[in-house]
Amino acid sequence: MSTLKRWTLKEARALFDMPFLDLVFQAQQVHRQHFDPSQIQVSTLLSIKTGACPEDCKYCAQSARYKTGLEKERLMEVQQVIESAKKAKAAGSTRFCMGAAWRNPHERDMPYLEQMVKEVKALGMETCMTLGKLDDSQASRLAQAGLDFYNHNLDTSPEFYGSIITTRTYQDRLDTLDKVRNAGIKVCSGGILGLGEEVKDRAAMLVQLANLPQPPESVPINMLAKIKGTPLADNEDVDPFDFIRTIAVARIMMPRSYVRLSAGREQMSEQTQAFCFMAGANSIFYGCKLLTTTNPTEDKDHQLFRKLGLNPERLSVSMGDQQQEDVLLQAVAEKDTEQFYNAAL
């Protein structure tokens, strides 16, 4: 069995310093060794609990500390989540990610979260959640419910992190990733560009991710969505070439991971997105809203896919659509009615 490469910051910086076209070419070569370059994984992200988060992440509209005009909402009812998942599947998504604006899940919410996972899986979709910090018991319960992926981003480098967040340490994030991995759940973890970081911070963040005991199976790279009312609302835009470079370096350093274009895609031109796919991005979030920010519409995505000759990746499942529907209906029929309909309470 081959051992995973341990990356140094010097090596990562050297990749960032490569001539742009050479870097993209190398990234595309690496990409083709592990993935079909014509396939794009399509994921949908739903905010199942919005706003009133106690954390102070300076980029986030969901923080209760900033006046962004975002209306807080309680945890969605399970039935609402399943209806959204059905629509996402019909639109072509194979993975459904559920995000909640919490520091960590409350124990009273765990049964509803577990049920969401079970019923989305009954649709034949991959499941992902992002709920903040987890303890060992919570990670184990989500794993037993069948959760495929857990998202918990590192955001930036350890050195720059304290300039962006003070209510949760970098080690807290690494500890949550360890708990997720130990529970048998796949890891989704990436970062954000445009926070005011330097190239060395982008390199250091990717080194942290690549050098985890096992690199994340999924690496979302976000471009800061500047939200009025947050401390970073007036930050400078990220140069598209710098964003593409980061995608390419992520692909080279984590060759077997899905590299996802996440927040900020609404602001990207088709040409920038195309270069990102050339640089090794092979996953997108799909749909009208990405938590609390806009995202390109499905029609625009389909048009771009056609222009580039790309196809949405299909998820292999063991059950046919009718079997999946039968499983879902049976799961609903067996549910405690009060829990199913009053998950928001």
From Swiss-Prot:
UniProt KW keywords: 2Fe-2S, 4Fe-4S, Biotin biosynthesis, Iron, Iron-sulfur, Metal-binding, S-adenosyl-L-methionine, Transferase
CDD domains named in the record: Radical_SAM
GO BP field = biotin biosynthetic process
Q: What's the Enzyme Commission number for this chain?
A: 2.8.1.6
* Database matches in PROSITE patterns: RADICAL_SAM
Instruction: Respond yes or no to whether keyword Transferase is given for this record.
Output: yes
The entry's family comment says: Belongs to the radical SAM superfamily. Biotin synthase family.
Summarizing the function annotation, the protein's role is: Catalyzes the conversion of dethiobiotin (DTB) to biotin by the insertion of a sulfur atom into dethiobiotin via a radical-based mechanism.
This one is known as: Biotin synthase
Name the species this protein comes from: Proteus mirabilis (strain HI4320)
